[in-house]
Amino acid sequence: MTDRYAVMGNPIEHSKSPEIHRMFAEQTGQAIAYERMRVPLEGFEPAVRAFFASGGKGLNITVPFKEQAWVLVDRRAPRAERAGAVNTLLAEAGRLVGDNTDGTGLVRDLTVNHGAALQGRRVLVIGAGGAVRGVLPALLPEAPGEVVIANRTVARAEALVELFADQGRLSAVGFDRLQGPFDVVINGTSAGLAGELPPLPDDLLAPGATCYDMVYGDQPTPFVRWARAHGAAMAVDGLGMLVEQAAESFLIWRGVRPESAPVIAALRPE
């Protein structure tokens, strides 16, 4: 019997998730089917209920439905509770359970795949939207020395600092007050895809700095290009994060963690 899984979003046509989970299934010998489901903007809850009522086993949720999924579930994993968003759903004893694997995906890609150190480091996070809130519950337990959240609207960054104040040394700042150097810089804005980077000072990076863009593309993103031009020792995009968060979802659903490296290599453009 083949178990059914899917990713729900709108738009969804460009999602790599079916390809990723197909490779995971082949690698681990799991019998699953995984599809894309484009859900009407007003039809998220009925689509989720219908999927599980028809025997579906698990869902990934992407934009714009992650916050709706957080509200919809009967129970949330602790990291999803703090994230304010859910990207992984499963049914347990008739109840809908929500988790968030985005932060774990980011941290595993940084530390396991790229060998970056976070403990004791000065970390800058650019942006204060849902993507950033989603990864802080996994980033902060890595014990960075300091985390600075920079955003055009400082009040949004301050709200995140208040929300996670018990998790470590955090501060909020506008781009006009940004002072380096930072050991790790994470871009959590989608503006990077459009080529519109926030105004970043030339002396932002410490020697040996790691720069990470949570978005990815077939070409180096504007932030990755900026990082390389400003002397980053390592500058990578978020393709590995995509694969690692999928691997974490697969582990939740199937009880086995697939190998991410061959999947990342298969997806990376030549």
Curated annotation (Swiss-Prot):
Pathway: Metabolic intermediate biosynthesis; chorismate biosynthesis; chorismate from D-erythrose 4-phosphate and phosphoenolpyruvate: step 4/7. Pfam families: SDH_C (PF18317), Shikimate_DH (PF01488), Shikimate_dh_N (PF08501). InterPro entries: Aminoacid_DH-like_N_sf (IPR046346), NAD(P)-bd_dom_sf (IPR036291), SDH_C (IPR041121), Shikimate_DH (IPR011342), Shikimate_DH-bd_N (IPR013708), Shikimate_DH_fam (IPR022893), Shikm_DH/Glu-tRNA_Rdtase (IPR006151). NADP(+) binds at G127, A128, G129, G130, A131, N151, R152, T153, V154, A155, R156, M214, G238. It catalyses: shikimate + NADP(+) = 3-dehydroshikimate + NADPH + H(+). Keywords: Amino-acid biosynthesis, Aromatic amino acid biosynthesis, NADP, Oxidoreductase. The active site is at K66 (proton acceptor). GO terms for molecular function: NADP binding; shikimate 3-dehydrogenase (NADP+) activity. Involved in the biosynthesis of the chorismate, which leads to the biosynthesis of aromatic amino acids. Catalyzes the reversible NADPH linked reduction of 3-dehydroshikimate (DHSA) to yield shikimate (SA). Homodimer. This is Shikimate dehydrogenase (NADP(+)). It comes from Alkalilimnicola ehrlichii (strain ATCC BAA-1101 / DSM 17681 / MLHE-1). The gene is aroE.
